Amino acid sequence: MSILLCFALKEEAAPFRKIAADQPGIFTVFTGIGRQNAEKSVRSFLATNSPDLVLTCGFAGGLNPELKLGDVVFEVQSPKSKVESQLFAAGAKPAKFFCADRIATTIAEKKKLRAESGADAVEMESAAIHAVCDERGIPCVTVRVISDTASEDLPLDFNALAKPDKNLDYGKLAWAIAKSPGKIGALIELQKKTSFAAEQLAAVLDKIVFD
């Protein structure tokens, strides 16, 4: 079976790529952040490839207070399949996702999204990827890992540091750090958390892709 795994950023996929390097039938696409980038990247791939399954993967912000850092959560919108039972067996939890147009950076914003949508987690690409797959009749499953919980603020407003295409402007990031050097410790801690989250995601993906 051939599987396409979609990640917005290389950092989200780094541990999994070590496991999946050069494995036949396993494809990885880095879409960039946001719906438009995701749709464009997936359409481009599917123009010349026909995978049996598409997984939309990466980080998600927690909206449900019960979700912890490193929890792997999933949503199966297609008819039930073997993948769903594999995800349960791998320790992943079913969840409802909200696909946002901006990064939820504060506790207050996450609380508001939770109240308005009833979602357990927030991310920025999966709705677009599911829509493209639905057009082609390709099963698609969202598999994400909680990288920041409902009870924590992010150290910076990353929306203000984005380019018009929603990808991070590293020049703006450097300037933001230079203006607020006190944020460096929190940013280092965030990097540790996201690295841990990526490892947890890779462990689950390993079980469902290669079992």
Regions inferred by a protein language model and the residue ranges of each:
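Glycine-rich phosphate- or other oxyanion-binding loops that anchor nucleotides, phosphorylated ligands
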Residues: 3, 7, 14-211
